[in-house]
Amino acid sequence: MYKYTDDKGQLKCSFCGKLQDQVKKLVAGPGVYICDECIELCNEIIEEELSEDLNLEMGELPKPKEIREILDQYVISQDQAKKALAVAVYNHYKRINLGMKMDDVELQKSNIIMLGPTGSGKTLLAQTLAKILNVPFAIADATSLTEAGYVGEDVENILLKLIQAADYDVEKAEKGIVYIDEIDKIARKSENPSITRDVSGEGVQQALLKILEGTIASVPPQGGRKHPHQEFIQLDTTNILFICGGAFDGLDKIIKNRISQKTMGFGAEIRGKNDVQVGDILKQVLPVDLLKYGLIPEFVGRLPVIVTLDALDETALIRVLTEPRNALVKQYQKLFEMDGVTLEFKEDALVTIAREAIKRETGARGLRAILEEIMLDVMYEIPSRNNISKCIITKDVVLRKEEPLLLTVERKKKKEETA
């Protein structure tokens, strides 16, 4: 049996055997003692093992094709965007694993800017990428940001969200992904630099520059504004991947104007105004168009990878409802299954839901709201009735012309007997 004291009755560490007066602190547990030196050694061992787990080894890092295949399971359509994101993310983490500086080449960070209408899958793509790579992920809204000294959030609060997502593990957070939404809302209000202060536009772009490029940021652990008597978390943003997204309404007109200037004159191809879809126009975006939109040159320069997304058409929205692993129809069917009920959506119902989302101009994001409106009453009713076997949603249910068709157990039995 282990003795916790020496011959003189002095307490000692159960692990290294050092006496109480030979160490700074001796912590008591149920039938055991541990000194501060052993605690420190244990912490070092744990940190070392965790840091090894954090490093995405080249063998473990998914290849661009593998990343694209996993994205396909969650995000419908947007093939070109998925390909571009897969390559950009692969190169980013390859750069981290191999070290930023080679003998002859310095690899720079490839932050991403995503352009696409509301509900086209920008946020979902960024979330899924973080899930694939098993890295911390944070979402921030650019509209809530202001430059330092004004009412609103400091840009450092974005980094705090990432640290919180990493359970305050700074090393883990330093390899995470940050998605900044509504980035188009911080565009400069006019093309010419303003004399007055634009605290939520150009000022925020200036404030974001350093963290996008890579800096040691001082992050207030409780959020809010900085004050001098506060302790800060030091976070290196060099290896954090920033993905900025926005709808950029009106950008297509800027691109059109640039293209039309080149296609004027003899021999120019004559095309109708509505011949080209907005998504096809956005694919021709250049950094100069983003500058004209109101982003400052330094900001555009720190987002070298430009990815464009298409508006989802009726066919794509129906696929969003039914195909992904987390498809809304599958989710509702699972919820009904838990109550012992089979849920069926008729094809015409899915088409009507998709058309309603297009009419509302909400894209895939609006599908959930439409389904909630349709399903609320029946989801309220079914748990209280134990004789329902099936619920059928038709086009007329979506259009509010009739109630969902509920089949009872008795009706089901009768059908089986007549068959």
Curated annotation (Swiss-Prot):
Biological function: ATP-dependent specificity component of the Clp protease. It directs the protease to specific substrates. Can perform chaperone functions in the absence of ClpP.
Renumbered to this chain, the signal peptide range is: none
Detail which positions bind Zn(2+): C13, C16, C35, C38
Biological process annotations from GO: cell division; proteolysis involved in protein catabolic process
* Annotated ranges, domain ClpX-type ZB: 1-54
Which keywords does this Swiss-Prot/TrEMBL entry list?
ATP-binding, Chaperone, Metal-binding, Nucleotide-binding, Zinc
* One of the record's GO molecular function terms: zinc ion binding
Q: Which organism is it from?
A: Moorella thermoacetica (strain ATCC 39073 / JCM 9320)
What the record says about family reads: Belongs to the ClpX chaperone family.
Name of this protein: ATP-dependent Clp protease ATP-binding subunit ClpX
Amino acids binding ATP: P117, T118, G119, S120, G121, K122, T123, L124
Give the highest taxon in the source lineage: Bacteria
Q: How does it assemble?
A: Component of the ClpX-ClpP complex. Forms a hexameric ring that, in the presence of ATP, binds to fourteen ClpP subunits assembled into a disk-like structure with a central cavity, resembling the structure of eukaryotic proteasomes.
Give a Gene Ontology cellular component term annotated to this protein. Answer: HslUV protease complex
Q: Which PROSITE patterns match?
A: CLPX_ZB
